[in-house]
Amino acid sequence: MANDFLFTSESVSEGHPDKVADQISDAILDALLRQDPRSRVAAETLTNTGLVVLAGEISTNAHVDYIQVARDTIRRIGYDDTDYGIDYKGCAVLVAYDKQSNDIAQGVDHASDDHLNTGAGDQGLMFGYACDETPELMPAPIYYAHRLVERQAQLRKDGRLPFLRPDAKSQVTLRYVDGKPHSIDTVVLSTQHHPDQSATATTMKQSFIDAVIEEIIRPVLPKEWLHDTRFLINPTGRFVTGGPQGDCGLTGRKIIVDTYGGACPHGGGAFSGKDPTKVDRSAAYAARHVAKNVVAAGLARQCQIQVAYAIGVAEPMNITVYTEGTGVIADERIAALIKQHFDLRPRGIIQMLDLLRPIYEKTAAYGHFGREEPEFTWERTDKAAALRAAAGLSPGEHHRKEG
């Protein structure tokens, strides 16, 4: 890669229409898991002006008021006024759930008498990633893009910037020198707002622009990275119509926002609305857990993990490690250590990360990774010391490539 380059990642707020859909899907998953941890769930959501459609496949012994869960989620996000295009009190909610296919269930439920050898719910490939660009071991562009829209929501909800509305998008372009973050080149922040914040049809009031820069952006970004940074605030001007009224929202359409902002490949499977027997979700969480522990152990400055599964088969097809030359031991040796220290069978993952709990709605906005809340068990670095010891490394041996 070039010595001096730019890299960009984006995020969206909890009020973005696709994120509204993700949060409803995960709120329904949580409601089911609270009553029946064995629920099999693939909950999809569509949001549009004044309308929510709930569809997918659910097999459960739980009794959940799906319509009320959807309304409560929309209210929490902040869509409580018909002027916003959707109002939790009056929107229509249509429910069209089926049961899980028996053909899938037989491969997952009866792959083995040993519950740890329960098969994967589908084929697929998943990636995990970690790097040392932030204390959370996340790529800096996506990490700070998340923090920007998270702060937008915080200041909207606590009344400090009462003219904001729920929908927002952020984008951070970071300059790298010698492979390390050097400075922030450009920040884009587009936020929905009340009509009185527009100066003209295509421009915003300067007071609005100043408030967004000083109250949202500057408190979040590292001061030492702000060298001649460009700030683009609502660059097309007026952003009054937003959320599900501005665009139809669907579950699973923000998979790069949900993961690493494009810093590593993506297997294509979305997360929200899926119970942890779906390896699209659980194995991606496990791959992040593995990669983060590898970096936390000092075995590499960055680590990409690929795992793949076949439906009905418990053991992964492969566990592949790529450290892009930053490893202190060979990638193949890191892969061998991973196999020794992590059980990446679907049931092993569920047990290792304690995933049969109602923890998922919180993951559905501001990223599934790089979060320190206790629900995010895949962010623990509890295997780092064991990995380091097994690699035979002492504290002074970081970043020495094995010959």
Curated annotation (Swiss-Prot):
Chain residues that bind K(+): 44
Binding site for L-methionine: 57, 100, 247, 278
Residues binding ATP, per UniProt: 16, 167-169, 238-239, 247, 253-254, 270, 274
PROSITE patterns found in the cross-reference section: ADOMET_SYNTHASE_1, ADOMET_SYNTHASE_2
Entries under InterPro entries matching the protein: ADOMET_SYNTHASE_CS (IPR022631), S-AdoMet_synt_C (IPR022630), S-AdoMet_synt_central (IPR022629), S-AdoMet_synt_N (IPR022628), S-AdoMet_synthetase (IPR002133), S-AdoMet_synthetase_sfam (IPR022636)
Stretches that traverse the bilayer: none
Cofactor(s) for this UniProt protein: Mg(2+); K(+)
Region described as Flexible loop: spans on this chain: 100-110
Binding site for Mg(2+): 18
Enzyme superclass (EC): transferase
EC number: 2.5.1.6
Reactions it catalyzes: L-methionine + ATP + H2O = S-adenosyl-L-methionine + phosphate + diphosphate
Functional description taken from the UniProt entry: Catalyzes the formation of S-adenosylmethionine (AdoMet) from methionine and ATP. The overall synthetic reaction is composed of two sequential steps, AdoMet formation and the subsequent tripolyphosphate hydrolysis which occurs prior to release of AdoMet from the enzyme.
Name of this protein: S-adenosylmethionine synthase
Organism: Verminephrobacter eiseniae (strain EF01-2)
Taxonomic lineage of the native organism: Bacteria, Pseudomonadati, Pseudomonadota, Betaproteobacteria, Burkholderiales
This protein's encoding gene: metK
